[in-house]
Design a protein with these regions (language model features):
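Condensing-enzyme catalytic core mediating Claisen C-C bond formation in acyl metabolism
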Residues: 1-18, 22, 31
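Conserved catalytic cysteine-centered active-site region
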Residues: 5, 16, 53-104, 115
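Beta-strand segments within the central parallel beta-sheet cores of soluble alpha/beta enzyme folds
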Residues: 40-50, 77-82, 106-111
């Protein structure tokens, strides 16, 4: 089984924002990409966890929107809603894709950003 590691992190300021969650996600994701010192083109998929986008923002396509805001409009995206475990569900699925070999280079190492 392949090993998985978090190689970059990013965060937005806590508090009220005038931006939608996909924009906040893109800001944190861009920070994580810089922190990991990888090219955005190394990202093969996006796993987006959000429980309020549909109701609060009237936007049901947050994953593809976030990928587009990151400049990666053609990568596959999956949005997760799982109440208080939403982030866990998204992270878990990203890990499963990497460890199964479905994502990442086909050798011993794997680069994948789960944001």
């Amino acid at each position: 089984m392949r090993r998985v590691a978090v190689i970059g992190v990013g965060v937005t300021k806590f508090g009220k924002h005038d931006r939608i969650s996909a924009e906040l996600f893109a800001e944190a994701a861009a920070q994580a990409i810089r922190d990991a010192d990888i090219a955005p083109s190394a990202i093969e998929a996006l796993y987006y966890g959000n429980v309020t986008g549909g109701e609060g923002e009237r936007q049901l396509h947050m994953g593809p929107l976030a990928a587009t805001l990151l400049g990666l409009p053609t990568i596959p995206t999956t949005r997760f809603e799982n109440a208080c475990a939403t982030s866990h569900a998204a992270f878990r699925h990203a890990m499963m894709e990497i460890t199964s070999g479905a994502l990442g280079p086909r050798n011993a190492s794997s680069i994948m950003a789960s944001l």
